[in-house]
């Protein structure tokens, strides 16, 4: 054996002892025209003659070729090798401790994120309920103000004829005063004009009869028009209230909470301005209406006075002086009635001004309450923004910890491969030199670490095949192999409403081979974004539209197909996943070295990387 080793050293092609291990990676993708594989496979092949263990083999060969002195130095070489492996084991143990610490830290951060997310959901729900209550109260207050405004409009319309009559009565009073003076002068010529007055009286009788009939019909029409106007006003107010309520309800269902508050505030200001403007116009027009009503009343009284005057001319011409005196008395009574009408007008005006002032105070109070609510909304929005920033920082920290953990995990994988190679090389050399390997110290830590470095005699190779198709913009981008989630992706530049759509999963997983899920009616997938539907057994927080937690579970098998259908039952997307497993019992080669180390890396789109050495 010594001669053989010396020959190898003295040959023309000595072995290269300073080269590092090399690896080759291959990736395989199997899919249809619209599908892509979500799992990548990386194979790492370790070559024995190019490992750092070559240095150890060269040192052992040099000792053997030196004759008896080389044989005497073999225990020292083995001792050095043992010390080197102890050093490697200690380093690897430190890596394992670091990974465990990182895992514990990640678990703590995940619990913190779940706590913050649950608190945020509860607080958002409370804020939403509080806002809904305030909006309902404001809507009821607005309905009450609208009803009061309708009542004021009806009262204004009812007082308008009285005001017109008062104005007409005032003008007629002036006319009657002038006619009274003319009548005193005309009494002297009454006898000469008696015949003409009698003829005119007959004409006046006919004209008065026609005017009386026309006046009755006009009064009936006015009453009917007043009733119709009152009904139309009530219907218009109710229709406006219903229309406003429907608009607010639609705005609330759209979920645009901040825009709704701004719109509501602007609407309140506009309504306040309109109410003030309408009340000012009503106040100006109410006086005109009351004067018109007064004028109509005076005109009716004037007609009655003219009838009395003509009858007096016909019946008692000789008592014309007494009739003139009676006209004076009636004029005084009309003056008294006019004064009373003016007092009533002033009282109505005062009452209207008082009502207008009360409405203005009520509007100011509502505006102050609305401003207070705006301040509260701003405070809550600021608090929500702070919470979201804190949650974002926590997510960033968690991502950083996961990246650090992944780096440590990659180093651990390479160290596992190197340690396995070193162990196999050492065992081969010890068998070739007929050397007995000394036992390792039987401590709990060494036993535990030894189990992690043990290379299995066999392994199972799992292969996944995915096929996907879609007829629209929504695609089924991923199916989790463990049945934790199904991901939908919107590949268009516009938002797509998927409310009422249905997901159906069919697998060969025993009797319960079907799982269906109906999407909520308000669900929308934003442009170039995705929505993930999680099983109920995961620890994911329900945060639509990005993450939705269903009540059931996804049941996957060796062959699983998922279809997405619209509310009408039209299939728009499909994805099928097939997994196959093969077992290889010849993991170690004839020399005791591993044939290859396989690294299976899951797709990074789900923010989880599962690395397995087989």
Swiss-Prot record:
Residues 427-611 are annotated as: Tail. Residues 118-128 are annotated as: Linker 1. Residues 1-51, 433-454 are annotated as: Disordered. It is found in: Nucleus inner membrane. Residues 21-37 have a biased composition (Low complexity). Keywords: Coiled coil, Intermediate filament, Lipoprotein, Membrane, Nucleus, Prenylation. Residues 1-76 are annotated as: Head. Residues 269-286 are annotated as: Linker 2. It is a lipid-anchor. Residues 129-268 are annotated as: Coil 1B. Residues 287-426 are annotated as: Coil 2. The keyword Lipoprotein applies. Residues 77-117 are annotated as: Coil 1A. Its main location: nucleus. Residues 1-10 have a biased composition (Basic residues). One of its GO terms (molecular function) is structural constituent of cytoskeleton. Residues 81-433 form the IF rod domain. One of its GO terms (biological process) is heterochromatin formation. One of its GO terms (cellular component) is intermediate filament. Intermediate filament (IF) protein, component of the nuclear lamina, a fibrous layer on the nucleoplasmic side of the inner nuclear membrane, which is thought to provide a framework for the nuclear envelope. Belongs to the intermediate filament family. Contains an alpha-helical IF rod domain organization with three coiled coil-forming segments (coil 1A, coil 1B, and coil 2). This is Lamin-2.
